[in-house]
C-alpha cells in the first residue's frame, strides 16, 4: 500500500512527503492511525490534502491540531488546497498564522492555475507571507510570469470558482460528478444541488459514471411526474 511504498522510497535515500488524498474523508480515529504509521516511517513532510475542496475553517483547525499533537515534531506539515469554495487563501492564512513549533509549507500555483476550479493562487499567499512573516518573495516576477505565460492559458482553458464545483465540495464528493452534470446541459445549479444531496456516501470518493447517470434519470423522472401533477 501507500505507506509501504513510502517506506521503501525513504530507504533508498529520497526525501519523502506523505500526502493522503481526501483527508476530509477520514474520521478522527482514522487520522490517529495514519499519524502513527507516518511516525513509524518518519518522512520529511506530511501534507494535509483537501482533495475535494470541502474544507472549512473548523475542519482545518481540527486536523491541524491533531497533526501537530500526534506527528513527530521534526516532520514538516504542509497544506494543499483547492478553490471549490473560494476559501483557499483564507485557509492558507489561518494555517500560517498558527505559528506551530515545526516547519510549515503551503503550495499553490500562479493565478491558481489547475484543473477547474483551481488551486491556491501562490502570488496571494506569497504577498501575505511578505507582509506578515518577513519573507521576501518577488511579486514583480510573479506578475510578469502570470502576464506572459499563465493569463494566455486561462483564455484557452478556464479555471476558478464556479457554483457546480462548490456543490460537489459541499457534499465532499468527487469533482467529476459536478463536471458530469454540467456536461448534461439541461440541469440548473439548483438541479445539481438536489441530485448531489441524494448521493450515497459509498459513492463519494471514486467517480462512478453509471451511478451518476442513474441518479440523473431518477431526478428527471421525478421532475416529469411533478410537472404532470
Language-model features, listed with the residues they occupy:
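Catalytic cores and adjacent flexible loops of soluble metabolic enzymes
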Residues: 1-229
Amino acid at each position: 500500500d501507500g505507506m509501504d511504498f513510502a517506506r521503501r522510497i525513504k530507504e533508498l535515500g529520497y526525501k519523502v512527503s506523505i500526502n493522503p488524498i481526501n483527508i476530509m474523508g477520514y474520521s478522527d480515529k482514522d487520522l490517529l492511525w495514519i499519524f502513527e504509521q507516518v511516525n513509524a516511517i518518519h518522512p520529511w513532510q506530511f501534507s494535509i490534502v483537501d482533495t475535494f475542496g470541502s474544507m472549512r475553517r473548523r475542519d482545518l483547525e481540527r486536523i491541524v491540531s491533531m497533526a501537530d499533537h500526534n506527528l513527530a515534531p521534526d516532520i514538516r506539515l504542509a497544506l494543499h488546497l483547492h478553490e471549490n469554495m473560494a476559501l483557499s487563501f483564507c485557509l492558507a492564512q489561518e494555517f500560517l498564522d498558527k505559528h506551530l513549533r515545526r516547519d510549515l509549507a503551503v503550495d499553490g500555483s500562479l493565478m491558481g492555475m489547475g484543473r477547474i476550479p483551481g488551486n491556491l493562487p501562490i502570488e496571494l499567499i506569497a504577498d501575505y507571507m511578505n507582509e506578515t512573516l518577513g519573507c521576501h518573495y518577488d511579486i514583480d516576477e510573479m506578475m510578469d510570469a502570470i502576464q506572459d505565460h499563465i493569463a494566455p492559458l486561462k483564455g484557452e482553458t478556464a479555471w476558478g470558482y464556479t457554483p457546480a464545483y462548490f456543490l460537489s465540495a459541499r457534499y465532499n464528493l468527487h469533482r467529476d460528478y459536478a463536471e458530469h452534470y454540467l456536461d448534461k446541459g439541461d440541469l440548473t445549479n439548483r438541479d445539481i444541488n438536489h441530485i448531489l444531496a441524494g448521493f450515497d456516501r459509498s459513492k463519494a470518493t471514486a467517480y462512478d459514471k453509471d451511478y451518476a447517470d442513474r441518479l440523473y434519470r431518477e431526478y428527471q423522472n421525478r421532475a416529469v411526474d411533478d410537472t404532470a401533477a
